């Protein structure tokens, strides 16, 4: 569903190219329960449930296309779900909140360090050092994500 959303209404943006299905399911349930709009952004087709508050935005392929689409559309007060540290930095600058699918909140206090670590790991990979990927998503990660989402939703309820 791609109906326009009312201006000024906080919403959740999902960098869906790498968002685990179990996290998307948590977001779908939250949208159904609370009426908060959830927009999944990806450079490929995404099957979404037919819920009034859930929509998918497919962007052209290419590096950072989904990230750019989110960064251009996000507003202060929105929540962005991403594991992409540069995207998290961009949305924090716009006054939005950002959280990883593991429930790790990004903050203006920690983002510079995270960008630095990311840059260092990229240098290692460029030099041929195997740095490995992220560990598998565990139940504790899902619980941490759900807890962060509930905190953000509670703040939205307090504002309205």
From Swiss-Prot:
InterPro entries named among the record's database cross-references: UPF0178
Pfam families from the UniProt entry: DUF188
Superkingdom of source: Bacteria
Disulfide links within the chain: none
Positions of transmembrane segments: none
HAMAP family: UPF0178
Family, per entry: Belongs to the UPF0178 family.
Name this polypeptide is given: UPF0178 protein XCC2288
Species this chain originates from: Xanthomonas campestris pv. campestris (strain ATCC 33913 / DSM 3586 / NCPPB 528 / LMG 568 / P 25)
Lineage: Bacteria, Pseudomonadati, Pseudomonadota, Gammaproteobacteria, Lysobacterales
